[in-house]
């Protein structure tokens, strides 16, 4: 990973960071989770692209609002942030763009995957809804404080359920990765599995910290590199160990 890019990644107040040092028409955009991370250090995540030349973009949801308030430095709403991020990608000459995200960042990757018309999205243990009714129905009591803050001051244009986007025609190819035995993560994934372009990959282990587990089993790098190389069958990069 470019040294300047790594240094910028380590600045937690940065809403977005871009590395255009590669001469490439492929870009990867990683969306940080509620704590701004990816379960593993961001520089380590990007390094898993290996020798593939790729423009790298990392965004953080500094408002801890499932990207409902946009991305600081790019725009204060979903639509304005998407427009700015599209300009960044266009300026980099990106013809193929793959989004990645973990947990709340997975929500962001799917959300912006549709807004930006990305080619492919890989969401690890993502939330697919954050509305009160569904959280009560599924008994999802996680992240109570940021959820309450979002409800107290809901932004215009909020998207609290990704299912309609995922079931609509068009949109990116979406790969959702979850631990098959994690009740809540599985429930979030099951709700969008009916989308024609959605594939759910149920891994044997990892819990909600699935990204770290996939890294440790050498599956994460294969997933990332396979996505950047182009569409294909992910069966050969699923984890082999529990």
Ranges and model annotations:
Residues 2-54, 58-65:
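Short, surface-exposed "cap/lid" segments of acyl-processing enzymes
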Residues 64-72:
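Glycine-rich "HGGG/HGxG" loop immediately N-terminal to the catalytic nucleophile
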Residues 71-91:
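Alpha/beta-hydrolase active-site loop
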Residues 134, 138-202, 208-212, 221-238:
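The feature captures the conserved acid-bearing segment of alpha/beta-hydrolase catalytic domains
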Residues 101-115:
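Glycine-rich nucleophile elbow surrounding the catalytic serine of serine-hydrolase chemistry
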Residues 50, 112-120, 191-195:
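Short, surface-exposed basic-aromatic patches at helix termini and helix-loop junctions that form
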Residues 93-103:
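Alpha/beta-hydrolase fold nucleophile elbow
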Residues 123-134, 181:
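Active-site nucleophile loop of the alpha/beta-hydrolase fold
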